[in-house]
């Protein structure tokens, strides 16, 4: 008889069930299920083949990126949030080529919906989408393959200065500029404010036919082989902004160790780092042989960047239609935000320039691209990443971006506290540097959300081996940082082939492999109005210690400072008493005197049992002590007017304002109550003594009881058990008066009677009383 096989796969075989199965087992660490379930594993490989290699051209290595975002099911404006995510962080003004597919239709697993974000046309307008720093990492064979693949989708355009042939190109772009673009490449389709559109694929030759006689005669169309030799290092820290610059050939890398800056318009980076010159021969899948290192002098000490910023700012203030500025402002630039080309091209480079090559007038001199200075993209964002936190608010991001560019000398566009850029430019550039982080904040009228990168699926296009990178959350799955470690597993999840990398190393090693990035959305707040009010609050900076996972306006958050827990059921008299005593407190106990009032979980606002634990946070040493503490917490005495309040039946606690320093007395309540309990136990254990000794002991005990009545009354005890009959009679709770001599005599008489009954050995009364105490 065959053994029954236990099947743990309860997911459907559609795309939603496939990725729910994959993410569930990945989060649980059940790698055996990911390998052993042949049905789901076959569906996974079929999905990757259909989305990564849709054109059946496997050798092309498209370096495609797919985003799979998991959004909680209680977020109803999911599509709108994803559009905001794409527009603000990826600078995608036009979303008609991007497909946002909702995979969850019938079954919703793990209370989350899955969305697939793909761009089959141009890979989110950047073939190097979501890569850190790499310069000409593709070899000539891969570049030619990319050219062939891109030519099948988008033909290379022929640009002319004739207004009749191309009406979208305005006259503010001169023919001299377009005649020099044939040595560079542009990426994607970008739509600016003047509705001018450039469409040319990455690493595709742009042959320019110049019809203007004033164009430069030295610039002629080049062959594809020459284009590959002087390949444009179109790489970016993230997303869809291109960095068009030339890189010298491999034998000439040695002179770059000590570069000389020949152009005054170029302002290097603020920091000085060692950057990796990514000139790899072949793409490697399992090993990382290392690449040549070059010293990048990011900034010279004798170089002042402030004068250059003012020079850039003065150029921007000129007339936008001046042809002399347009011709002199030609440069090979790499800017974060693509500003409107109605202004000069130099203004866009003065706004947000991360790295650029030598600049100059093409009419006056021929630029030696071979000796152009190479600056890694990482050198320009090192200071930003080091100062970033995982939960960065939009205003903090805004201040960080402006501060970073001011320090680097690139010109943040501020002069005497006035901003030059409008809101549209800021909204498209503030998040560009921060989008590389595994944690991305989205603040809108819909709410305050955070996208956290949890894992990455990578496939080798040659061997079809599937790699899995998992971020180590350190017990914080909703918080991410650039300093987190990533574990890179092979297709078998073997522990012998496990690599620990950073996110930068991971994306740099597997830079030419297609990837699927798994993001998880975290709800910080459901309403954006609360967040905006918190941003306007000047005390917001002091709240850095509070976790972002809690609501910003929460009144139920607990601090690390020592607190005194108060009962949840208190009346107005107790509140008035607390307010009066705060002004009179001498501050003997600083930790207790700082508390202005009770801070508790209110059952009407939070239906949980946590309040029960807070009530019993203080312990007692005996049942007798508990009984006296409960009695003293129920009954309060007014020393000024000698009014007696009987609350034993109602169970309400009232503290009058005439009692001095209750917080100080409260700190000594345990000691006083324990002393009284010890004396009571000692007295019960003693043998019968003389009558004089009994009277003297009773007087001392009465004094202790009187002094401890108010000290043990700050914390209300549980109301589930009634006060024992014996202790009720001993305390004199049934008497109308309590502070007179008559009450003292009555108290003394009752204590003596209790002693006599005990010494006489009356069985019935003695046993009942002892049972009441026990």
Curated annotation (Swiss-Prot):
GO cellular component: cell periphery; cytoplasm; plasma membrane
Compositionally biased region (Basic residues): 680-689
Main location, first listed in the record: cytoplasm
Region (Disordered): 145-269, 281-322, 338-367, 387-423, 557-603, 637-701
Polar residues compositional bias, start-end: 159-179, 234-244, 260-269, 284-297, 557-566
Transmembrane segments: none
Regions of compositional bias (Low complexity) in chain numbering: 180-218, 338-358, 667-679
GO biological processes: intracellular monoatomic ion homeostasis; intracellular signal transduction
Keywords assigned: Cytoplasm, Phosphoprotein
Sequence positions bearing Phosphoserine: 165, 304, 616, 622, 707, 720
Biased composition (Basic and acidic residues): 311-321, 637-649
Subcellular localization(s) per the UniProt record: Cytoplasm
Segments of skewed composition (Acidic residues): 222-233, 413-423, 577-591
Described purpose of this protein according to its UniProt entry: May be involved in the Ras/cAMP signaling pathway.
Remarks, miscellaneous: Present with 222 molecules/cell in log phase SD medium.
Protein name per its UniProtKB record: Protein GIS4
Native species: Saccharomyces cerevisiae (strain ATCC 204508 / S288c)
Lineage of origin: Eukaryota, Fungi, Dikarya, Ascomycota, Saccharomycotina
Gene: GIS4
